[in-house]
Amino acid sequence: MSKSENLYSAARELIPGGVNSPVRAFTGVGGTPLFIERADGAFLYDVDGKAYIDYVGSWGPMVLGHNHPTIRNAVIEAAQRGLSFGAPTEMEVKMAELVTELVPTMDMVRMVNSGTEATMSAIRLARGFTGRDKIIKFEGCYHGHADCLLVKAGSGALTLGQPNSPGVPADFAKHTLTCTYNDLDTVRAAFEQYPQEVACIIVEPVAGNMNCIPPQPDFLPGLRALCDEFGALLIIDEVMTGFRVALAGAQSYYDVVPDLTCLGKIIGGGMPVGAFGGRKDVMEALAPTGPVYQAGTLSGNPIAMAAGFACLTEVAQPGIHETLTDLTAQLANGLLEAAEETGVPLVVNHVGGMFGIFFTDAKTVTCYQDVVKCDVERFKRFFHLMLEEGVYLAPSAFEAGFMSVAHSVEDINKTIDAARKVFAKL
């Protein structure tokens, strides 16, 4: 047995499923998950000494590549002054200044510890601010594992084949209205059914938890218009897309102004950080200035703030997003060419530094219904054969892939060559 297999066997005796987040268990592809010993740049190194070109990037945060020296040194320096104080620090102020500068729609920001905390808190704030209970989300979109959001969710829920999680009371779920991504008619119908009851829409501006689905040109502006018409708030969940699709997020790329924005992943540089923010009048409804309660023992802790500040400072440097976008486009185009050469039907969606691979005869993949028609069994074979070639992709047909600026053109070409070889075997 390999060392990964031995560790996985031991882990399953102590940790449910052997992992601390379900998709890591390779449930979506079968087999034994890799146990990682270290990572550097664009590469992962497992406990058995094998190296892999990594397109998971810790599920999105590693836009600069793994073990970036600026972030690492910032963490070391901060740790020497103490790990957590439970009191305000100067770095929290600097971080808030930087985030609100980079994302102009955020007048104020509150730091939390995860993307789930960010979306959960933003929805509570929207409900408190509007005095309404219902929310609109989209089929196949994942916004963390808060109870009200685990209704027809994407990501791990799709991987497990469970659109709704047991343990979510029907009384909670009844306030969540689910519409079709990229279909404004379903959203208008929901509003017209409950014209005075919808507090907010929450949406991934690029759906990254049913693989990678960009919005149609009229979709996000249409959501903004509907929120204005019916007096609801628009929450854009940029946990995945923030600082990756563009410096100011997908909202700037697609030119839409939300009332609230949720951030995660890149904002922490690899440390557990989330944030939510937006209009000043809405944010001032939060405790202690307002009645909507939200708190966290480790929120804004000095280690995470130091890592996040260092990461965002680097990400804001000129040329970063142009490089990220160019590398992603090179990979996507190369995969499509290799698939065409070998007669494999393939769609590759991409925007900014994220991409999605779909085995399908369809010409486009634009919504949940398109995604679930794709050939999952072929993806499973593709995943394992690519792993043998030293390429680590997301271990699920329903997860997006992530590029970093640490990837080289040589890494991209090696990946395309590996895919060409693998496509010929499918």
Swiss-Prot record:
SUPFAM superfamilies: PLP-dependent transferases. The modification N6-(pyridoxal phosphate)lysine is found at residue 265. GO terms for molecular function: glutamate-1-semialdehyde 2,1-aminomutase activity; pyridoxal phosphate binding; transaminase activity. Pathway: Porphyrin-containing compound metabolism; protoporphyrin-IX biosynthesis; 5-aminolevulinate from L-glutamyl-tRNA(Glu): step 2/2. Its cofactor is pyridoxal 5'-phosphate. Its EC number is 5.4.3.8. Keywords: Cytoplasm, Isomerase, Porphyrin biosynthesis, Pyridoxal phosphate. Gene3D superfamilies: Aspartate Aminotransferase, domain 1, Type I PLP-dependent aspartate aminotransferase-like (Major domain). It catalyses: (S)-4-amino-5-oxopentanoate = 5-aminolevulinate. GO terms for cellular component: cytoplasm. It is found in: Cytoplasm. InterPro entries: 4pyrrol_synth_GluAld_NH2Trfase, Aminotrans_3, Aminotrans_3_PPA_site, PyrdxlP-dep_Trfase, PyrdxlP-dep_Trfase_major, PyrdxlP-dep_Trfase_small. Pfam families: Aminotran_3. GO terms for biological process: protoporphyrinogen IX biosynthetic process. Homodimer. Belongs to the class-III pyridoxal-phosphate-dependent aminotransferase family. HemL subfamily. This is Glutamate-1-semialdehyde 2,1-aminomutase. The gene is hemL.
